[in-house]
Amino acid sequence: MNSHYENKRFRRKALCTSIALGLLSTPFYASAQQDPEVEEVVVTGSYIRRSEGIIAASPITSLTADDITDQGTLNMAQIVQNMTFNNGSGVTNSIQASGASSNGAAFNLRGLGTRATLQLIDGKRVTNSNVQWLMPSIAIQRLDIVTDGAAALYGTDAVAGVINMLPYKTYEGLKIEHFNEEDSRGDFRDQTTSFLWGKALGSDVDLVVAGSFRHNGTLEWADRPKLMLAGLTDNNGANPTNWNVPQRDDSGALLGTTAKTADPICGTDPITDPTVQGGNKFGTLAFGSCWFPFGDTRDFVEQKTQASLYSNISWEVNEDLALSSQLLWGRWQGHGRQNQGNPGTRFADLSTVRGEIPGNPFRAMSGDGRELFAQPKLDGAGMILSDPFGNQQPLRNGAGAVVLASNQFTNLANDPNGGVPFNEDVPFSGQYLPFGLANTLPQAFDSDDISRKENDERDMRLSFTADFTVPYLDGWEGTSTYSYGEHSVVSAQTQHFSFSAVEQGLNCDVVNDASACFNPFGAADASPYRNSQAIADAIYTRDRIDNKDILQTFDFVINGDISPGGFELPGGAIGAAFGYQRRDETDQNVPTTHQQQNDRLNSIAALPTKFSRNSDSFFAEFSFPILANLEVSASVRDEQFSSGQGDVVSKFGITYSPTDWATLRATQGEAFIVPSLNQLNSPEGCGLSNVDDLFTSFSGFITSCKSGNRALVSETADSFSVGVDLTPIDGLDIHLTYSETDFSDRIVDTTTQDIIRADFAAFQGSSGFVATDANPLPSISQLTAWVNNPLSDPRIQRDPLDITSPTRIDRSDTNASSMLVKSWDIQANYNFDLDAIGFGSWGDFRASLNATYADTYTWQEAPDKPVREAKGHQNNSFGAVPIIPEWRANASLGWSLGNHSISATVRYIDEVMFDANEFSFQQYLRPENLWTTTDVIRAWTQTDMFYTYSDLEVYGGNATLSLGARNLFDREAQKTGMIAGVVSQIQSPLGRMIYARVNYEF
């Protein structure tokens, strides 16, 4: 995308015009006027102390502890998703390109990516942006959200804005709270117990401690059968699977070619309903292929347990020095369900499955369909060798090929020139999946034969702060902080398999040690060819990784007034802040033992890595009170990294209050994001990714491997905002903000579909291929020629024996995208009581509206790609952009009288054009399917409501009881053909959620 020079000139002109108008139209206020003494505080978005309640140039949204309570959930991911200016977050799993998950959520302001939003706790950086368990929600006193660029103050990452969770540092008493929520169908429950305790230890020490414990159960896909049956529940990678079976001519001679053939046991289970646990154990046979049903193994919300702890101790040593220490600790353990194995193996490195392997079902046949027989293999006594199952062994020549009998069409029992029956040697295909219900499963699987995840992540941050009076500088104050943060992942890798164990099982002695053989084919429950338990357990590995991110920061900030020789501007003294920050980052990755030994079936070897870097930053901020009601601010920051990245960025702002009920504000700034250590250096990691192959009819999961890219450069952005804040009458405040972000060199995690799409476009440009009704897809010869063309993308790997099946796509982050985002935010709040207008004392009412209008969201994948409009689209096939509805809005009405209060909120998300793969073929897989075509994801409206009774005196303390419901009218999510059957970024499959909250303070 070309730089938006005209927009930049407009922004500068608008800012300068605002300043000039303020200077020309503002009446002069005498400097001798004395204002009453007010408390000064440092607020998010500035390091300069200001009068409490003053309006800043940057748009800031603040949520108090009560506001967070009114959201009706302790799940911070849900609170994030509810914000109108946040896009791309989710609270349920979908296995879609969006990456929506019930296990983690981070702020994604304006949909510019989670790394474009800087997340702080108490003004300090954290190593993990997952808001679900960073700290107990009961400990959050306020949540500040700055919705424009702030890198000039906070450094890298603050492109779209800054999130600052501000915890309690003083508290007196003990508050205990229990929160329970469950869906009205009784399928899901989520419970949290938390406490907050604080005490003043004498006159100069304050101690606050808070903790929470949360556990939620599982919401399975099968608990929402309408959605599940509408969405994709089968994958082309399977077990039983499709094999590349050798082809022969009519005489029985090998032709050197293979034909994709489904395992004969596929599709023989009479239970075809995917919602039935353990059904479809032999797969689904359709379109000549075997498909793997996985819907009964997946969850919308995975079972997990979270614990978090917060503590803060403050000591006011004297009037010039205060010391404090703060501890954050959290742990998350997840036990989600998943299918028994995933497709994508080192199939080309595996030995061919010999025909002698017990259970091989592919009887050797001539081209015209006649059974073939081989010369028998004899022992030293001239007897025909047989395995323990009575299968006679064929003779092989020096090249390892089976030697056909003289009369290859007759059994030796009927003709002395005949031979023994034999099966074909079949190589593995890229669609092979190591485990399924059709053979023996590892003992580590649960009793329901489902693989359970063992996620285990831990976070901690310890910080020490000194607040002091700056010597020799009258009125100046300073803050110095050291923080040590650590995020560790010691999760078990529960879909990993031993390459050597499979190889050993394939190369077993079928005559003398058949129990050591590995049968990769399907086998009925009573079959003698089922693998032994020892074989299954040897192949399945459950090693743990040991990854660790460490962040150490040292901050030094001083702030005060500059008035050389007593000089002051008409509005007062110039405010200033100067600071320095040192950051040391370490990224340590320790793969599983099997992966270090190159013994993982799913990926290549990976060795432990450890990368570090540091950065030094200097910044300055100034506030120029030109007049009593006109202020201009400026800030600049120089941040340089030892890894070679860095930038010098600035930001300017203005606030102008022509009356006491109106304030105009504007900002213009620069921002940047340096690549993370993981983006630069991460070793190869492989997982599962869904792909729709544009060259063939293949649709399903394949292996997707990602590694670091050391060629990445910093992302850069220019931002502009202008707004007005109005308080025209008592109790009413209105805020309108226009914001614009011009983002370039965006680091994009290219999806597998991005890569396939780009490769297909290159193929069309090279070959001139145009799809028609008669030929909707390229021919096999065209595809083969393209794969051999140096212009094709080498990151796409295909099965050499079945070129129509992609098996693996390699990817990495790239500086490949630019974006221009323009939006409007509207906030209005009105508090009133009917008594004031003569209707009697019916209590206090409060009404609020929060809305975001996406004016435009244009983006470009790469300089040679077209500019696209993301607004109003699902954007499912593009990894760079989330769903961008044109409108999002929340409207609330609350009432309180005495101890009673009621609040209702209506949430609205605009419709968007559906553009994901619908997997239309699934409508033919089974009769239970509810697939329907989709062109628009309809607008989503839900109503949340709660009732609270507060200050109930119980045993010397006060109790508060709340009952409420989210999605009160049980709005059902729209069915789509996507995986999971729901667009989980903007619509929830949970249905009506009923909750109760009780807290007790004393």
Report the location of each language-model feature:
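N-terminal Sec signal peptide and the immediately downstream disordered periplasmic leader
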Residues: 2-84, 194, 198-199, 319, ...
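Short loop/turn motifs that connect adjacent beta-strands in outer-membrane beta-barrel proteins
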Residues: 34-36, 170-173, 202-204, 318-321, ...
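N-terminal periplasmic accessory domains that precede
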Residues: 76-79, 105-108, 157-178, 193
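Extracytoplasmic beta-strand/coil segments of soluble accessory domains associated
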Residues: 80-122
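Short acidic/polar hinge/loop motifs at secondary-structure boundaries
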Residues: 124-149
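Surface-exposed, low-complexity loop segments enriched in small/polar and acidic residues
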Residues: 229-232, 268-304, 320-615, 669, ...
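C-terminal beta-barrel architecture of Gram-negative outer-membrane proteins
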Residues: 687, 845-953
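C-terminal beta-signal and adjacent terminal beta-strands/loops
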Residues: 742-744, 855-858, 905-923, 949-1002
